[in-house]
Design a protein with these regions (language model features):
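Alpha-helical transmembrane segments of multi-pass small-molecule/ion transporters
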Residues: 1-302
Length: 302
């Protein structure tokens, strides 16, 4: 029931973004500025706030969890760069679909669902498992959205992006068991909490300007959505099960990557001047479909 409530809350925020666009409060220029604020300000705050709670995870689990997290994204690289060529022949669309297959919306949906299934302490483990996401989404993710491939096209400055700096800082706080004073933790958490509603409203606002035919989505959108919500997480689950990863870690990791398409896809499209049509379609369809698929996937893991 809690899983369903989380998904309904998310859907309400998405609908709000649509209404704000239709009423004239949101539009192209506003959405672009808000996207930049989310990427450069509120997202780093959200990352830091994930390690500013009253409890910190067992330090002995940091490296194993980070290792599983990085291996997960190595596996997802195969999905991101190889599978899309079987879904679309268009190079730009392949990049967008690759992003959708690699990156899930963990921040708002993933953590609450992990908490409801495995207990509050599991959120810390989910945060560690998802930490490599920050590195890959701001490197490989940007590469896929921009349609510029190859290591030589990877800008080293991305390692100094606000989100990456926040991820490094968060890792240090956990490694050295630093408990952040409430005077600092509370404002950081408040700013970080802006990320999810802002990102979701931007997604729906951008979709409000699309023709109804595009909102409904094409066959390739539904194929990509099925891969995103079912094939990708279950493939990773069974692979790591064979490799001997503990059941708890494997289950948490699977739930984390079984979420809808990451909202950063639309943010990146707007920031880098790319067409957000396909990305917003996949984000919208997976968000709506996940109301049913997430409970189903979690049941399969029990």
């Amino acid at each position: 029931m809690e899983n369903l409530e989380v998904m309904v809350i998310l859907f309400i925020i998405v609908v709000l973004g649509y209404a704000l666009c239709k009423l004239g409060y949101m539009g192209d220029k506003f959405d672009q500025k808000l996207s930049s604020i989310v990427i450069d300000v509120t997202c780093p705050a959200l990352i830091l706030s994930s390690v500013m709670g009253t409890e910190l995870p067992d330090r002995s689990l940091i490296l194993p969890l980070l290792g599983v997290g990085f291996l997960t994204y190595v596996v997802l690289l195969v999905f991101g760069f190889w599978v899309p060529r079987f879904v679309s022949k268009d190079r730009d669309e392949q990049g967008m679909i690759g992003f959708a297959l690699m990156f899930a919306n963990v921040g708002f949906i993933g953590y609450p669902i992990v908490s409801s299934i495995f207990g509050p302490k599991a959120v810390f483990y989910a945060a560690l498992l998802n930490m490599p996401n920050t590195f890959f989404i701001f490197t490989v993710g940007v590469m896929l959205v921009k349609g510029v491939y190859g290591v030589k096209n990877l800008n080293p400055k991305v390692l100094l992006s606000p989100a990456m700096i926040a991820a490094f800082a968060a890792a240090l706080l956990v490694a050295f068991s630093v408990h952040t004073p409430d005077l600092i933790a509370r404002p950081v958490t408040m700013v970080g909490n802006i990320t999810v509603p802002a990102a979701l409203m931007v997604i729906r606002s951008s979709m409000a300007r699309l023709p109804l035919r595009e909102v409904v989505g094409s066959v390739k959108v539904y194929v990509a959505s099925f891969l995103r919500l079912f094939v990708v997480p279950l493939s990773v689950y069974f692979l790591f099960k064979v490799c001997g990863v503990s059941d708890l870690v494997n289950q948490i990791n699977t739930v984390v990557i079984a979420m809808p398409v990451a909202s950063f896809g639309t943010m990146f499209c707007m920031k880098f001047g790319r067409s957000a049509s396909l990305m917003t379609e996949m984000t919208f369809v997976t968000t709506v479909a996940s109301i049913l698929t997430i409970p189903l996937v979690t049941m399969l893991l029990q």
